[in-house]
């Protein structure tokens, strides 16, 4: 025993860790017996002191941290900014959730770190502080919830609740916080029960993996080691952890300080030597670990190191595997008991913040940092090496060292305030981040109509549903409007865009029956004023419209209907608009019209020269029966070389169109039946039948006449020709008339009779046999191309001839060639003539290289009417076509109040008047999800708001002469819809600037010259591409659009040169909130521009949702969504929430290699990379070996660090060597690839790395394998003992496979011997289970065998090599299962 005088007096607080150190030093110094005597005295002293001080714990001892107030305030400010960005549509829901969690988690962690210094400064003898930080009871997490903040909670599904609990348990929780807190508490109670059983099972699995590992030798002879240094590349290792890693290990290399050797190889490290090495500043120390041991199934004393029980080198025969398994599994049961106290508090892995200690200036070396952005897109600096940051205030200079790969969030020489975040330390990259794929559903906040601002594609697995994939980042908009379902009957009364009174809105989405029409606006459009009395009747009186419907000529009075434009029902397919014409009778009976103008855009949206732009099928040229088309002697030129596809009810046929040069053609009717080959035909060829004769079992003839049967490939054509049969006398006269058309008056001359024909006839010679023939005279339907609707008047030619040289030519096409038969498909009618508009542009222009133009439909709502524009995008040229026009010259003037169903504004005072009451709205028809009933969307005044009036906007009155120079086009006599486009010379798209201030959308528009500035006419509309349309209801004069430029011009006007800032407000444009439309104040709400007037804009309220690529959009474009409907689904990766409660599952996930994306994928990538590079450099055998070795070494170190981190976070100390033994077992296998070794191993077989290496050497051929990471369960089922595997899991399967393969169990492990009742090969039974034989003796045996079976030497070489290697290694290493 040492003398009392030599003892050192330590005056410091002794916590749990210090007591551990004290005990270990006492054992080293005095031995076990004396140490126990000392510890008894310490225990007695402790009880005496506790009794004397009588420490008690009261609620007043829970001291809240003073900095909590401003920390929470700071976090709330950041959350508020984030919420604003989300509201503006700059941040999508998943980003918002992630950032919100990070903000609150960082706040909570900082509070937790502040806790200990706060107690130490204010009240070091606080009972809570003494109790928790000494390790007696409770840990930092629990105290943090008592005096810090409870923080973020997980819900029962493990998802984060993004509303943090800001209070702590000392302050008390609000009602909302209490309910959220109950989630976590319930989760904690359930977890406790489940986890206790899990912990026991984890211990069992761990022991299964390593039960056979026993210390069998003193030294395996390895020369490898693992280098440990206190300053690692990725992180700073604390001195305590460094000492703990080194103590009890054995050195792999000599250590030199200068030229002096201070420690030699195979020396074990004690506390004195470790302290000496640290103080001498040794950079790295190479130590032996279980990873470096050369065996796979056992371990040597030097690689294991000291025994943790008595501090000497471990004894031979020690079952270190079972000790390791229990050391890791046992704290698991401890951890599960702790979960009860803390509940489901989130402790995820996010970045730590470095805050400035006081106000001052920041200084750092700018050459060592690089500008970058954080993961949230904020600008920052990235440092690659340790960076010293100095904070200078008036009298203090404070220095902080920022570790590598961290973000600096402030600039050099910037003034920072106290506690401002100056840097963000990222977690070390050496650990694996556990990630899982999560679906986040975004639900609609309000009812309305869905729009999106980009193209979407159908999700492949939902081709026939309404789920779409977004290809790029874009906004989804929900345009406001309340909907009411309806039956189809209501649509006989209500038309799109009508105003109506709504007595009540049904919240339950029932259909509303008591709707009445307010047809004031409608009557101004197309009805007489006396219609007001008949409002309630529901069927308008169309008597005012003059129309005669002749039965013979089909003379529709198109102009009346076209001008009045009462009900244009646009049937819109994906790329076609049908604009129908209705006869008066059809309108009265609400028939669906049979004909109309179809504007068709090719599916790819590209027009080429001479493309057909629109066509009109006149019902006069429509036939129900089949027949033959004849032009007679008239000419028709095929002007379209490329055959055009025409769609007939889904059946596509190629038709060539022929341009009519003349105004007459003939149709010869015939009845045609196409029958299958096997049909029974009941009539004979060339026989004559009457009407309604049975042709086959189920087909009867509709006309009488001559039967003609033609048998073709796999089908029979049966034709019936109606007409008169004549038997002529002279052949030569008839042959001239065979198959030709005869005009009226020409007679058929016979010897006995002469007959005059009133109509055209078709004479056809028929020859049933070679000698017999007769002539069939068939009736002919004569068609004359009368002036049908003139499509050219829809698009006045003058408009397009000015600058862009667009020509729209009208052609009548006959759809069938001369003499070609026409066939109807399943009782559809056949269109003979089609009136087409062909689009062409001038080839002499300098833009003649333009071979194709893009076209698309633009839907714009203005003045309460939906209009469809077609955009054709030439270079600097547009033509437009408006579907609805309600102010045609014949319909009288419409007052602005009736045109605008939303508001009227008094121009003098600029006072806002709402002309819409709350129960007064506008109907729009929409798709609905359930297709049985359509639904109405009602826009009421609450859904719209007005911007303006813009009093500061001034217009320039320029001299009238310049207007005179520009030709004016009157549209008094032109009938039909008309749109005129004004081209803006330089148009820049708008980009909102992401700032927290007001955002001003300002454009710089340069005018071509001063002549182009004109007085702005009262009302105009701008479509979404910046073109401005003059829609003055009081004016029948349209300014020539290609000589004018219209602008919103602000005040500054220079006399000669005009470059103005102007705000372009496009109709249909979407605005996010907080954009400045006017200069004075930002726009208060987001929405879509609905009406543009001279000094104000009406905007329909809308809410933007930002969505990222790959998000799934539920629903169709313009579909009505109700509040709470699923709008979009995000799929994103999130770090698995590491609850305090989830320490154990994390360990299990690492050991079972269960994480979806992290460990396995990282390992796979690493392996592929190494294998590719190294195989290419070193050749195949070495490449595979070194690639696998490097992969295994890296993954082993990563796994050990990960497991240690989990346990250390819970305050549990486990020696690295225990974890290393487990990890060595789950990383020691390689997977045989399919390419090679088919003669020894099967592809997909798991073998040890050493065995693969040795077998490859013996076989002298390339082995293809790669490292694989097994979980502990798989490793337990892939050992060399089938008895051990069968006693663990799947007993029948394991035994059956072992029997089929003829496996041998060498009974090397403990478990196999226990099962069979033998002596276990550990401890005292260590030497009894081994068979010793000399190397020389075995070699002689093998040689004898080889001589005896020399005949088979060539065939069996592979097996002998394998056996020789097997026996050599087993005898030399005293282990049969080495390979």
UniProtKB/Swiss-Prot annotation:
Q: Which reaction does it catalyse?
A: RNA(n) + a ribonucleoside 5'-triphosphate = RNA(n+1) + diphosphate
Q: Which Pfam families match?
A: RNA_pol_Rpb1_4 (PF05000), RNA_pol_Rpb1_5 (PF04998)
Q: Which HAMAP family match?
A: RNApol_bact_RpoC2
Biological role stated in the UniProt entry: DNA-dependent RNA polymerase catalyzes the transcription of DNA into RNA using the four ribonucleoside triphosphates as substrates.
Regions that span the bilayer: none
Its family remark reads: Belongs to the RNA polymerase beta' chain family. RpoC2 subfamily.
Query: Where is this protein primarily located?
Result: plastid
Residue positions binding Zn(2+): 220, 293, 300, 303
Domain of life of the source: Eukaryota
Describe its partners and assembly state: In plastids the minimal PEP RNA polymerase catalytic core is composed of four subunits: alpha, beta, beta', and beta''. When a (nuclear-encoded) sigma factor is associated with the core the holoenzyme is formed, which can initiate transcription.
Its Enzyme Commission number(s) read 2.7.7.6
Q: Does the keyword Flavoprotein apply?
A: no
GO CC terms, sorted: chloroplast; DNA-directed RNA polymerase complex; mitochondrion
One of the GO biological process terms: DNA-templated transcription
The coenzyme or cofactor needed here is: Zn(2+)
Q: Tell me which UniProt keywords the record has, alphabetically.
A: Chloroplast, DNA-directed RNA polymerase, Metal-binding, Nucleotidyltransferase, Plastid, Transcription, Transferase, Zinc
**Subcellular localization(s) per the UniProt record:** Plastid, Chloroplast
Protein name (database record): DNA-directed RNA polymerase subunit beta''
- For the protein in the UniProt heading, the enzyme class is transferase
Manner of cofactor binding, per the entry note: Binds 1 Zn(2+) ion per subunit.
Matching CDD domains:
RNAP_beta'_C
Keyword Chloroplast in annotation = yes
Q: Which GO terms describe its molecular function?
A: DNA binding; DNA-directed RNA polymerase activity; zinc ion binding
């Amino acid at each position: 025993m040492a003398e009392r005088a030599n003892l050192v007096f330590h005056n410091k607080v002794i916590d749990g860790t210090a007591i551990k150190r004290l005990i270990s030093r006492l054992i080293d110094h005095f031995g076990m017996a004396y140490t126990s005597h000392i510890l008894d005295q310490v225990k007695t002293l402790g009880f005496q002191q506790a009794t004397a001080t009588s420490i008690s714990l009261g609620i007043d001892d829970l001291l809240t941290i003073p900095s909590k107030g401003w920390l929470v305030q700071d976090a709330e400010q950041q959350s508020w900014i984030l919420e604003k960005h989300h509201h503006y549509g700059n941040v999508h829901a998943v980003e918002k959730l992630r950032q919100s969690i990070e903000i609150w988690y960082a706040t909570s962690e900082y509070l937790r770190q502040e806790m200990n210094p706060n107690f130490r400064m204010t009240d070091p003898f606080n009972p809570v502080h003494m109790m928790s930080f000494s390790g007696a009871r409770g840990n930092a997490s629990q105290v943090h919830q008592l005096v810090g903040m409870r923080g973020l909670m997980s819900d029962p599904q493990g998802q984060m609740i993004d509303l943090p609990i800001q209070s702590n348990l000392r302050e008390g929780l609000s009602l909302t916080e209490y309910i959220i807190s109950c989630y976590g508490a319930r989760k904690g109670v359930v977890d406790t029960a489940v986890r206790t059983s899990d912990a026991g099972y984890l211990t069992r699995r761990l022991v299964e993996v390593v039960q056979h590992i026993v210390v069998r030798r003193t030294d395996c002879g390895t020369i490898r080691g693992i280098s440990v240094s206190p300053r690692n590349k990725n992180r700073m290792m604390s001195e305590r952890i460094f000492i703990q890693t080194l103590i009890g290990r054995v050195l792999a290399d000599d250590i030199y300080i200068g030229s002096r050797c201070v420690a030699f190889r195979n020396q074990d490290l004690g506390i004195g030597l470790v302290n000496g090495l640290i103080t001498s500043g040794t950079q790295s120390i190479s130590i032996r670990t279980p990873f470096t041991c050369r065996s796979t199934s056992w371990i040597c004393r030097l690689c294991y190191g000291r025994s943790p029980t008595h501090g000497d080198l471990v004894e031979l025969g020690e079952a270190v595997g079972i000790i390791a398994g229990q050391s890791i599994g046992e704290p698991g049961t401890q951890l599960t008991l702790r979960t009860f106290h803390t509940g489901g508090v989130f402790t995820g892995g996010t970045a730590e913040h470095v805050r400035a200690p006081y106000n001052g200036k920041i200084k750092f070396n700018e050459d060592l940092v690089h500008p970058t952005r954080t993961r949230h897109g904020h600008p920052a600096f990235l440092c690659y090496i340790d960076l010293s940051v100095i904070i200078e205030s008036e009298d203090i200079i404070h220095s902080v060292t920022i570790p590598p790969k961290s973000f600096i969030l402030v600039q050099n020489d910037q003034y920072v305030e106290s506690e401002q975040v100056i840097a963000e330390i990222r977690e070390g990259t050496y650990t694996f981040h556990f990630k899982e794929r999560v679906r986040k559903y975004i639900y609609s906040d309000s009812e309305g109509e869905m729009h999106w601002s980009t193209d979407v594609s159908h999700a492949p697995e939902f081709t026939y549903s309404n789920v779409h994939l977004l290809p790029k980042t874009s906004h989804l908009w929900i345009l406001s409007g309340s909907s009411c379902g309806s039956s189809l009957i209501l649509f006989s009364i209500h038309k799109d865009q009508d105003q109506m009174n709504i007595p009540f809105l049904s919240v339950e989405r029932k259909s509303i029956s008591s709707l009445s029409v307010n047809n004031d606006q409608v009557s101004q459009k197309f009805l007489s004023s006396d219609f007001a009395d008949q409002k309630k009747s529901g069927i308008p009186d169309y008597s005012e419209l003059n129309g005669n419907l002749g039965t013979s000529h089909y003379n529709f009075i198109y102009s009346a209907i076209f001008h009045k434009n009462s009900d244009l029902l646009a049937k819109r397919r994906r790329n076609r608009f049908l604009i129908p014409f209705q006869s008066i009778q059809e309108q009265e009976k609400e028939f669906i019209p049979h004909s109309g103008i179809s504007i068709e855009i090719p599916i790819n949206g590209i027009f080429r020269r001479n493309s057909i732009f629109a066509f009109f099928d006149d019902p006069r040229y429509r036939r129900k029966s089949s027949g033959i088309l004849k032009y007679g002697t008239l000419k028709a030129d095929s002007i379209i070389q490329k055959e055009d596809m025409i769609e007939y009810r889904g059946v596509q046929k190629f038709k060539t169109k022929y341009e009519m040069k003349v105004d007459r053609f003939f149709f010869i009717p015939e009845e045609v039946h196409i029958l299958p080959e096997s049909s029974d035909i009941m009539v004979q060829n060339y026989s004559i039948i009457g009407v309604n004769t049975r042709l086959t079992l189920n087909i009867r003839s509709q006309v009488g006449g001559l039967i003609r049967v033609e048998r073709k490939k796999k089908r029979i054509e049966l034709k019936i020709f109606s007409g008169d049969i004549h038997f002529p006398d002279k052949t030569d006269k008839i042959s001239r008339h065979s198959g030709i058309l005869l005009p009226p008056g020409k007679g058929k001359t016979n010897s006995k009779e002469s007959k005059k024909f009133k109509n055209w006839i078709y004479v056809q010679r028929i020859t049933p046999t070679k000698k017999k023939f007769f002539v069939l005279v068939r009736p002919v339907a004569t068609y004359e191309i009368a002036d049908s609707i003139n499509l050219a008047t829809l698009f006045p030619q003058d408009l397009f001839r000015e600058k862009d040289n667009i020509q729209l030519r009208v052609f009548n096409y006959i759809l069938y060639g001369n003499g070609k038969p026409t066939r109807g498909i399943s009782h559809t009618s056949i269109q003979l003539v089609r009136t087409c508009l062909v689009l062409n542009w001038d080839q002499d222009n300098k833009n003649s290289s333009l071979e194709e133009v893009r076209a698309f439909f633009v839907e714009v709502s203005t003045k309460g009417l939906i209009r469809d524009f077609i955009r054709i995008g030439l270079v600097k040229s547009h033509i437009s076509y408006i579907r609805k026009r309600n102010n045609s010259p014949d319909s009288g003037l419409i007052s602005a109040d009736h045109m605008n169903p939303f508001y009227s504004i008094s121009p003098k005072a600029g006072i806002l008047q709402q002309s819409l009451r709350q129960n007064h709205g506008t109907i729009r028809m929409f798709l609905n999800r359930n297709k049985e009933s359509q639904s109405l969307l009602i826009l009421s005044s609450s859904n719209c708001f007005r911007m303006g009036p813009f009093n500061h906007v001034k217009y320039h009155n320029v001299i009238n002469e310049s207007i005179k120079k520009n030709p004016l086009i009157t549209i008094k006599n032109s009938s039909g819809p008309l749109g005129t486009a004004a081209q803006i010379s330089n148009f820049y798209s708008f980009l909102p600037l992401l700032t927290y201030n007001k955002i001003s959308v300002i454009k710089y528009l340069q005018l071509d010259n001063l002549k182009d500035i004109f007085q702005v006419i009262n009302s105009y509309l701008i479509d979404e591409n910046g073109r401005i349309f003059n829609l003055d209801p009081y004016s029948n004069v349209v300014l020539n659009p290609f000589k004018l430029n219209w602008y919103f011009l602000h005040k500054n006007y220079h006399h000669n040169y005009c470059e103005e800032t102007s705000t372009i407000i496009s109709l249909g444009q979407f605005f996010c909130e907080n954009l400045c439309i006017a200069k004075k104040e930002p726009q208060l709400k987001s929405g879509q521009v609905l009406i543009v007037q001279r000094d104000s804009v009406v905007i329909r309220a809308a809410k933007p949702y930002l969505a990222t690529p790959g998000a799934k959009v539920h629903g169709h474009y313009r579909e009505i969504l109700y509040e709470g409907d699923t709008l979009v689904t995000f799929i994103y990766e999130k770090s698995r929430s590491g609850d305090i409660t989830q320490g154990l599952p994390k360990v299990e996930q690492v050991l079972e290699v269960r994480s979806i994306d992290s460990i396995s994928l990282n390992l796979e990538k690493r392996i592929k990379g190494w294998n590719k590079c190294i195989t290419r450099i070193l050749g195949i055998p070495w490449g595979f070996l070194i690639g696998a070795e490097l992969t295994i070494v890296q993954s082993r170190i990563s796994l050990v660090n990960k497991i240690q981190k989990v346990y250390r976070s819970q305050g549990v100390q486990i020696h690295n060597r225990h974890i290393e033994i487990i990890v060595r077992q789950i990383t020691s296998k390689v997977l045989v690839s399919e390419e090679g070794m088919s003669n020894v191993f099967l592809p997909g077989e798991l073998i040890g790395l050493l065995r693969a290496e040795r077998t490859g050497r013996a076989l002298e051929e390339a082995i293809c394998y790669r490292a694989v990471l097994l979980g502990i369960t798989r490793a337990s089922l892939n050992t060399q003992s089938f008895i051990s595997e069968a006693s663990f899991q799947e007993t029948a399967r394991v035994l059956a496979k072992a029997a089929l393969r003829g496996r041998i169990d060498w009974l090397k492990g403990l478990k196999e011997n226990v099962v069979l009742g033998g002596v276990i090969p550990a401890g005292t039974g260590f030497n009894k289970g081994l068979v010793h034989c000399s190397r020389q003796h075995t070699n002689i045996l093998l040689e004898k065998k080889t001589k005896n079976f020399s005949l088979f030497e060539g065939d069996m070489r592979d097996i002998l090599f394998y056996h020789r290697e097997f026996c050599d290694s087993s005898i030399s290493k005293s282990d049969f299962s080495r390979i």
